[in-house]
Design a protein with these regions (language model features):
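Short glycine/serine/threonine-rich phosphate/pyrophosphate-binding segments
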Residues: 9-10, 76-81, 107-112, 156-158
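Beta-strand/loop-alpha-helix module characteristic of Rossmann-like adenine-cofactor folds
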Residues: 100, 109-177
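A short linear-motif detector with a strong N-terminal bias
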Residues: 1-4, 21-24, 104-107, 125-128, ...
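Class I S-adenosyl-L-methionine
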Residues: 1-102, 134
Length: 177
């Protein structure tokens, strides 16, 4: 889904969602994609391999062919898409599942934010606190420009407090959420 706005889906991702017989993902992603989901498609709140694999097998037993699994953010940057892709590829490799697996990325959140802010990002340090730890203060001190992917509002508040405590309250922040 990329940044989560249906206007910003790639055509490929939009088609995959529209043609899917089953669409899986977190509740908010299913809601965001709802305008593109076929009326007769089944929606399932699932995005972890442990939940998806048994469900995919049950769908396949019923003859379901097209299944879309939704993720937000960038598919290649600390995304849950990686774990699901690896799990599905392993099932295919072991001969347990016959499937073609395609990752259809949305528009990159980094690219989108940088464009909206009028900033380049080829010289930026890219850091994620989305489900992981990072020493943002050290990065801000060391790097000329830092692009930071966060989990949400609570991360922003915590990072702001850390920067202020470190005497970095004068740094420029551009926030997209």
């Amino acid at each position: 889904i990329g940044v989560g706005n249906t206007k910003l889906f790639t055509g490929e991702a939009g088609e995959a969602i529209a043609q899917a017989e089953v669409v899986c993902g977190a509740k908010r992603l299913l809601a965001a994609a709802d305008p593109l989901i076929a009326p007769d498609a089944e929606k399932r709140e699932a995005y972890l391999p442990a939940d998806l694999l048994p469900y995919i097998y049950s769908c396949r037993e019923k003859g379901t062919v097209r299944i879309a699994i939704l993720f937000s953010g960038d598919t290649g940057f600390y995304s849950g898409a990686e774990a699901v892709h690896k799990a599905l590829q392993e099932e295919v490799r072991l001969g347990k599942l016959q499937a073609g697996i395609t990752i259809c990325p949305g528009i990159s959140s980094l690219s989108y934010l940088a464009a909206r802010a009028g900033k380049s990002w080829q010289d930026a340090k890219i850091v994620s606190t989305h489900g992981r730890e990072a020493d943002v203060t050290a990065c801000v001190r060391r790097e000329k420009k830092v692009f930071l992917i966060v989990s949400g509002r609570s991360d922003l508040i915590r990072i702001g407090e850390e920067l202020e405590a470190a005497g970095l309250s004068g740094v420029e922040l551009t926030i997209g959420y």
